Amino acid sequence: MSAYIIETLIKILILVAVFSALGGFATYIERKVLAYFQRRLGPSYVGPFGLLQVAADGIKLFTKEDIIPQGANKLIFTLAPIIAMVSAFVSMAPIPFFPNFTLFGYEIKPIISDINIGFLFFLAVGAAGIYAPILAGLASNNKYSLIGSARATIQLLSFEVVSTLTILAPLMVVGSLSLVEINNYQSGGFLDWLVFKQPLAFILFLIASYAELNRTPFDLLEHEAEIVAGYCTEYSGLKWGMFFLAEYAHLFAFSFVISIVFFGGFNAWGFIPGGIAILIKVSFFVFLSMWVRATYPHVRPDQLMNMCWKIMLPLALLNIVLTGVIILI
């Protein structure tokens, strides 16, 4: 087995382990953030400051009975959470997480694969995760799960169109789909960040990412007040945990991509080294998603579709046209 294959396998194992741990810890942080906004304490009993709540929840999920409802399609019911996990982690393959560094005289590139269509790969593989809620709802033999899967089809496919069109304008400026090249394009300094050249694209992509991540206010797939837990209604134990671990892993992936594409990535930020700079940016966008969840109300399906097709899609197309005109001029 070649050194390249061994290195890649080690990177994959580290990526899965790190983001699985981060996903679990993010649940604790989110509960604390929501508690602060709602003037509650949040997790505070298990361990100091409730830090061991994540471990307690993990033990609970691993030891709960795995129930498959009567009349459900067992194969598809089991495959759905696996698809969610696989799509979330595979989509991270073209993301350069940190600058290259040297370890024991060997240069380490913190990226699985620097493919020249990295941004497109990220969106395409992430979009494949749409099948997870759809199949989960169809296989559960539950009306609430079925409604959740129908909403997943409408919501995720609609916003996938918007997010794909939105990235075209920044890519026209950079001239590459590689996330490494996009990062290098902004290496000149603070004013080279694409958020200043493409502010509309950033806003549209941020909103579309919340919709694709099924984050509030776009949590139509599993809104408790309407459809219990949506496509997850019949899931329990480890399978239920896999869905939410995939959601948080995807949240971190989108935060990295937004930081790389619009905010200079892992380039040095003044006196702040690149590795620390991207951690600050990613942490901000993860916190922002939690802040939005605590602040904005849930939207209705018709409001969501109107915003997507009548507002965001025309704005994305207009931004492409304006960017093309400016480049030609």
Curated annotation (Swiss-Prot):
Keyword Transport: no
Predominant localisation class: membrane
EC id: 7.1.1.-
Keyword set includes Translocase: yes
One biological process term in Gene Ontology: aerobic respiration
InterPro entries named among the record's database cross-references: NADH_UbQ_OxRdtase_su1/FPO, NADH_UbQ_OxRdtase_su1_CS
Membrane topology: Multi-pass membrane protein
Top EC category: translocase
Recorded catalytic activity of this chain's protein: a quinone + NADH + 5 H(+)(in) = a quinol + NAD(+) + 4 H(+)(out)
Gene Ontology cellular-component annotations: plasma membrane
One Gene Ontology MF term: NADH dehydrogenase activity
Localization in the cell: Cell inner membrane
Membrane spanning stretches: 9-29, 42-62, 75-95, 117-137, 154-174, 188-208, 238-258, 269-291, 309-329
Keywords: Cell inner membrane, Cell membrane, Membrane, NAD, Quinone, Translocase, Transmembrane, Transmembrane helix, Ubiquinone
Pfam family, one: NADHdh
Family membership noted in the UniProt record: Belongs to the complex I subunit 1 family.
Function in brief: NDH-1 shuttles electrons from NADH, via FMN and iron-sulfur (Fe-S) centers, to quinones in the respiratory chain. The immediate electron acceptor for the enzyme in this species is believed to be ubiquinone. Couples the redox reaction to proton translocation (for every two electrons transferred, four hydrogen ions are translocated across the cytoplasmic membrane), and thus conserves the redox energy in a proton gradient. This subunit may bind ubiquinone.
Subunit field text: NDH-1 is composed of 14 different subunits. Subunits NuoA, H, J, K, L, M, N constitute the membrane sector of the complex.
Name by which UniProt lists this protein: NADH-quinone oxidoreductase subunit H
